[in-house]
Amino acid sequence: MPNVSMRPVVRSSLSRNETVDALRKKIDQIDEKVVALLNDRAILAQRIGDAKNSTHREIYVPGREKEILQRVSQLSRGPISSAAIRAIFQEIISASRSLEAPLKIAYFGAEASYTHLAAKDKFGSSAELLPTASIRDVFQEVAQARASFGIVPIENSTEGVVAHTLDLLVESDLKIYGEAYLEIHHNLLARSGRLEDIKTIVSHPQALAQCRRWIVSHFSNAKIEEVASTAHAAMMAATDNSVGAISSSLAKDVYKLQIIAANIEDHSNNITRFLIVGNKESPRSGDDKTSLVFSVKDEPGILHRMLQPFARSRINLTKIESRPIKDKPWEYMFFLDFKGHSQERRVRKAIRELEKNCIFLKVLGSYPCGL
């Protein structure tokens, strides 16, 4: 039997004989309808915002936004791709949310850093994005209510976990409220745009590590300098023709640079996971993840025994990471990610059983799984 797609074929209803001007007039008419519908949608969003404010409910609900993005991306039958539909609706959601209440989002790094890109991708252009000098500053901005939420990197698919973020999650009273994933594409940027001018290559240590083979292959004699962020590297390149910065494509426009080489990362599947932190726990969405940290006495087979409650409750562990305990040599904390929400009965039961044998346990947050 031939492999026949059941997806309906989409054909234009427009006549091939129509002039460009006639087609543009039809587009203008459609645009008028789209704008009217967007404003109708915005009015409904305002009413939802009023209802939320009257009951002190959180304006930003990541589970609901995820549900919308998944639904609308499945509605499209082309020619616009599902990814493009998601991007369009992310901006529609951002604009609608800003009518309910303005969101201030603190992020690590300067403008055009990868965390900035993740914040723009997650919250859209209608949110107020606040750059900070450090990951600790992100936590402080949220804790002191100068920002609604913060976004920080937690792990990269090639370089591993961001240890400082783990440490701050243990220290802070903030909760993980959501997560986001961003494909990382590194670019070599310079002011002059001429490869022969570059004598020094600068970037964040992780970006340099992710482009190590490319650098050796193309700039074996260049001086390599580590700086605080990829955005800071772009700032340096903007003032010195001899400096090449490994940074994001957005940095080209922000800092008036030229792209000398694009997508120079050694591994194409380079993805960074980010956490959204806030003062409250995210409500259940039906597709959630919980993160917690615990420590135990060092005994043979202890970790295996500690994970048994999750196996008995049929809870899927998605990540386990160990981290040394400060001032206690050879003692460790264990960070767990698993599917489920802390409000679920089976999850509560597993956590209670785990806690019986722990020296320390802290639930870091339950939140919708990222797209």
Regions found by a protein language model. Give the residues of each.
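Domain-level signature for soluble enzymes in the chorismate/prephenate branch of the shikimate pathway
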Residues: 1-371
